[in-house]
Amino acid sequence: MCIRDRHDADELSHYSSGTADVEYMFPWGWDELEGVANRGDYDLTQHAQHSGQRIEYFDQQANEKWIPHVIEPAAGATRTAFAFLLAAYEEETIDEDTTRTVLRLDPRLAPYKVAVLPLSKKDTLTPTAHEVFDLVKGRWMSDYDETQSIGKRYARQDEIGTPFCITVDFDTLEDKAVTVRERDSREQDRVAIDQLVNYLSERLPS
């Protein structure tokens, strides 16, 4: 990012005595995220002229009257969100035949913070998987996904930027623990269900 504060006269709006642009390097080059314009006393002068009311401030100590100036920041949410997506998007080479698409969003921006993925749709796992989902969904935006293979589900969550995936497997029924996979490193930890909230709370912003 950079700030461009030098503009030719024909680049300025008629009301602006100076403008600073916050710019981001998009794939097509530098472009504006936000503009901050010094509108001077243009707005209040216009209001005064058309309303017939005096709009000014009297400084008693200096015995002076003056019209306040207006600074106008203008930012677009769409373009800023697009910049976040561009900065986070990566196609990572795993090996000669495998490329992983991952959206490395800051966890605060990720649509889902956690996804619960039962290893199988078999009835033996479903109740426990839903218990785990109920445990996390009240604290973080969470997704529940049981369709296709576990690898394809990991890939889907990587593509939408989910920081943590929780896999409920058949060992969970015995050891009361789940596998937690971190998005960026793909590292996995075995975490007891009764410690899961603490584990995630240490790694996800509140």
Residue ranges and their predicted role:
Residues 4-206:
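NTP/phosphate- and nucleic-acid-binding module
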